[in-house]
Amino acid sequence: WLKENLTDYYVIGCGRSAELRDEQSAIAYRKERMNLMKMDTYWLSETPDVPGSRYPGQSVCPRICTEAVFEDLEAGKVFRVANAHLDNAGELARRKGLEQILENVKSDTFFGGVPVIVTGDFNMEPDWKEMEVMKNHPDFTNITENIGVTYHGYWKGNDQTCIDFMIVRGSIRCESL
């Protein structure tokens, strides 16, 4: 759907299964505006380079993070984006997944100092204890803290839960959400 409807964009990422199919945590970026400098997809697990791997106690679905480093051709700035879909069933898997993403971003010796945007469906609410991981990373700020409910369109009903997040580090200015 993304590739068919966002023709001015490239969509990068791969499927989460061992065969690199199924759901993706893709990143879409405008072709004319961004230069892709680096891209990686890794599994949220103790073996991040093994396709389809999972944390113990996690749901049956493997979870991934797609990361990319871009150069904004208009602004001349470099920044990193990480997009993920954390586990829906395992509290420990969500906590470890978020920690893994933030640590992975920090451990990059080449692009480690660039501004970072971490986005995704974290499958947790802002006040859940899994979000305490953020206390270990005070250089990251949750800029979606007060935006209210996010809507994904999968089901109808009265679910008033905010489970989608945008966490930033560095000189990031958000003009709209």
Regions found by a protein language model. Name each.
Residues 1, 19-24, 89-90, 125-128, ...:
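Short catalytic/ligand-binding loop motif for oxyanion handling, primarily in non-cytosolic enzymes
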Residues 1-78:
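Structured beta-strand-rich core segments of catalytic domains in phosphoester-bond hydrolases
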Residues 33, 92, 96, 103-117, ...:
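Metal-dependent phosphoester-hydrolase catalytic domains
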Residues 48, 88-89:
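Sequence/structural signature of outer-membrane beta-barrel proteins
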